[in-house]
Regions:
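Conserved active-site "lid/cap" helical segment
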Residues: 1-87
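Conserved catalytic cysteine-centered active-site region
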Residues: 45-53, 61-63, 94-117
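Short glycine-rich or small-residue beta-strand-to-loop segments that form or flank ligand, phosphate
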Residues: 87-94
Length: 117
């Protein structure tokens, strides 16, 4: 058994345009109709200046979790032959689009043109 593993390429995908801290609540909404009182404190402490949301300002989803993974995999620029030679695909998320079928099964279906649902 060959136990060596090599990372040959990496890719990422971020949806839509970056959203500034000032625009956050336009995407996420207000708390009881009011701006968050702790937002400035948290943002000052975490240092994040922009972020990406997979939704519009009226909270319409633009990309699913599976879409994000599929776009990142597409970004690897693999030929169909190399893609078909993948022997193991590991996926993880803290917030799946759905529980069944699993996130990994859904990504596998999207990547290998064999949708699960």
């Amino acid at each position: 058994m060959n136990s060596s593993v090599y990372l040959n390429r990496i890719a990422s995908f971020l949806p839509n345009s970056p959203v500034s801290n000032d625009e956050m609540e336009l995407y996420l909404g207000l708390v009881n109709g009011k701006a968050s009182r702790v937002k400035p404190i948290i943002l000052r402490q975490n240092g994040i200046k922009t972020r990406y949301y997979a939704l519009t300002k009226d909270q319409q989803i633009t990309h699913t979790n599976v879409d994000l993974a599929k776009h990142a995999i597409d970004g690897l620029g693999l030929s169909e032959d190399k893609l078909n030679n993948i022997q193991f695909l590991s996926c993880g998320t803290s917030m799946p689009d759905q529980y069944m079928p699993s996130h990994a099964a859904m990504v596998h279906g999207a990547v290998f043109n064999n949708p699960v649902a």
